């Protein structure tokens, strides 16, 4: 009988695993700098090559970035929806997936999130204020065509982020971010033949308000139906303008640097009354 041999982890993998646990558990915060190499040598009792390999493993994981020069060091990064979306978008691009594929997935998945939002017992504090805030921003900036699509997309991203289920927030939220970058590129970039017309924008904003009303009332079935109808219309409008390309991962990579970027999980919003941003 053949003896099954188990591969022993290398020293570098053990060091990387310990540091990874420190990052994911929150013992090391976003933006923290890892201790100096001399300190890590002393803590783990490993050779310089093993420590460098451990740092490289964490860098490949996206959990640290190494700064060079006088202010150098290994800076900690916690996993985010944006980084997850970037990884998913790279896989989708490698498989030649298109915006049509992503939007079809969202047509099936986002209405589920809408229903979950409406079914939350704490929706009046954990869902409604966030969606009201987004609609307030949309309304205040309605005439600024360059801001309409990013603002509208954040309503959808917020809807998913408040559904109350962390795996769905991460996975569906990543698809939302991928679709958001495509839709913004279509309407605000070179691909669009014309800006979104006033009638279309008003209809979309009205749909958002109706969806919010259904969620506020706790009517999950109506929230699902409204989300399905709204997503179908939005998908038709966008895909009629731009469908030619596969998913572009570089658009997601640039997400954190865009001026209108906001985290997927919002802090508690202020009142949307009088918003002028």
Model-identified regions with their sequence ranges:
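Conserved amphipathic alpha-helical segments that form helical-bundle/coiled-coil interaction surfaces
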Residues: 102, 106-189, 207-210, 222-236
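C-terminal all-alpha effector/ligand-binding and dimerization domain
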Residues: 178-277
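Short helix-capping and inter-helix turn/linker motifs at the boundaries of alpha-helical repeat units
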Residues: 10, 146, 201-203
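Short linear motifs at protein or domain termini
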Residues: 1-108, 112-115, 119, 246-248, ...
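Hydrophobic/basic alpha-helical segments enriched in Actinobacteria
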Residues: 27, 32-39, 94-98, 121-128, ...
């Amino acid at each position: 009988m053949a003896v099954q041999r188990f591969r022993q982890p290398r020293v570098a993998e053990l060091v990387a695993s310990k540091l990874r646990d420190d990052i994911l558990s929150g013992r090391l915060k976003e933006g923290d700098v890892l201790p100096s190499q001399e300190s890590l040598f002393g803590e783990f009792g490993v050779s310089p090559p093993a420590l460098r390999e451990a740092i490289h493993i964490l860098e490949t994981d996206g959990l640290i970035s190494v700064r060079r020069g006088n202010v150098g060091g290994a800076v900690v990064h916690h996993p985010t929806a944006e980084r997850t979306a970037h990884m998913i978008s790279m896989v989708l691009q490698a498989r030649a997936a298109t915006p049509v594929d992503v939007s079809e997935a969202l047509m099936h998945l986002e209405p589920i999130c809408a229903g979950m939002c409406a079914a939350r017992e704490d929706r009046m504090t954990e869902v409604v204020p966030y969606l009201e805030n987004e609609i307030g921003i949309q309304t205040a900036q309605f005439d600024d065509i360059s801001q309409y699509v990013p603002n509208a997309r954040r309503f959808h991203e917020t809807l998913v982020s408040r559904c109350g289920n962390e795996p769905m927030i991460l996975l569906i939220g990543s698809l939302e971010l991928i679709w958001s970058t495509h839709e913004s590129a279509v309407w605000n970039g070179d691909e669009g033949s014309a800006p979104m017309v006033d009638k279309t924008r008003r209809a979309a904003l009205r749909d958002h308000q109706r969806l919010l009303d259904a969620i506020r009332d706790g009517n999950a079935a109506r929230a699902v139906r409204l989300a399905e109808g709204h997503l179908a219309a939005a998908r038709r409008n966008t895909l009629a303008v731009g469908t030619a390309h596969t998913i572009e991962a570089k658009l997601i990579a640039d997400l954190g640097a865009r001026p209108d970027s906001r985290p997927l999980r919002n802090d508690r919003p202020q009142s949307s009354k009088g918003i002028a941003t």
